[in-house]
From Swiss-Prot:
Coiled-coil region list: none
Family affiliation: Belongs to the PlsX family.
Protein name: Phosphate acyltransferase
Function: Catalyzes the reversible formation of acyl-phosphate (acyl-PO(4)) from acyl-[acyl-carrier-protein] (acyl-ACP). This enzyme utilizes acyl-ACP as fatty acyl donor, but not acyl-CoA.
Gene3D superfamilies with a match to the protein in the record: Isopropylmalate Dehydrogenase
GO biological process annotation, one example: phospholipid biosynthetic process
Quaternary structure and partners: Homodimer. Probably interacts with PlsY.
InterPro entries for this protein: FA_synthesis (IPR003664), Phospholipid_synth_PlsX-like (IPR012281)
EC number, UniProt record: 2.3.1.274
GO MF terms, alphabetically ordered: phosphate:acyl-[acyl carrier protein] acyltransferase activity
Amino acid sequence: MICVAIDAMGGDFGCEPIIEGTIDALKEREFTAFLVGDQAQMEKFVPKEFINRVKFIQSNEIFEMKEGATNVLRHKESSIYKAVELVRSGECQAVVSAGHSGATMSLATLRVGRLKNVARPPIATLMPTSTGTRTLLLDVGANVDCKAEHIFQFGVMGEAYAKEIMGIKEPKIGILSNGEEDGKGNEVTKEAFKLLKKMKNFVGNAEGSQIFDGSMDVIVCDGFVGNIALKSSEGVAHAMNKLIKKEVKKSPLAIAGAVLMKKVFKIVRKNTDYDEYGGAPLLGVKNCVIISHGKSTPKAIKNAIFQALKFSNSNINSVISNELEKFKNE
């Protein structure tokens, strides 16, 4: 049975929503949850009928958001450190944390370790599209300065994720650029373009709008650009939501129309809701590491755990290592 280490203290709202999400996941899937944090606090939120499916790991410290990422190596009593150590030791196959993302990445890379041939592990996230599908965007923040070789590797890892986790047999892969034409981009992306052409599913440059139109399954970029794209899209979605609500309230006719459109709004919200997938995997490290938002709801935590279970039951890491080895020898 898969064992998942859960950093119960890392989120912005304490352990309650994280444990609630864990219990919701236990209701639907078979796995053992290792809850890491203050046991006295955590026990309050675990129903008696689930006690046998949960293991408590005592942690006496919460790693603060104000800390530098690599400082976590000195905080061995922190919940995130202990959660990652459960994966490193082999007791758990996956870790889910809504805590300090930089600390989670540092621990995953330095303590769990990278897969063979992986230079830089990227964070991958699923972006909504107008077709109802998802575009995998990576890197969205792990590596702000990248070489062409790193971006090429992101393409290999993204393709593996699309095939093994998303179930897409022949995923279309693009590189984020300032135009679709082959000659567009900066020196790094142009060089990465040449390397990516070795992949049979590479289709070329992708403009920012193509993240959301469903024309590509995987889009790669460095973590600086990717994080800006991610945060910009979140900002636009939030602004549009506020604008629609503001305009609807101005007119009784608009309110009536909104009531009639309630089902449509619900579908749109579901397609664009972060809670539906719950977290972003850090690819290229041994085992599975899922990074969730600090403000994650119980639903987001539940779906992050589902991601971890699907990842742990797949062959994705073997595929990544084998594909990178193949390209290395070409």
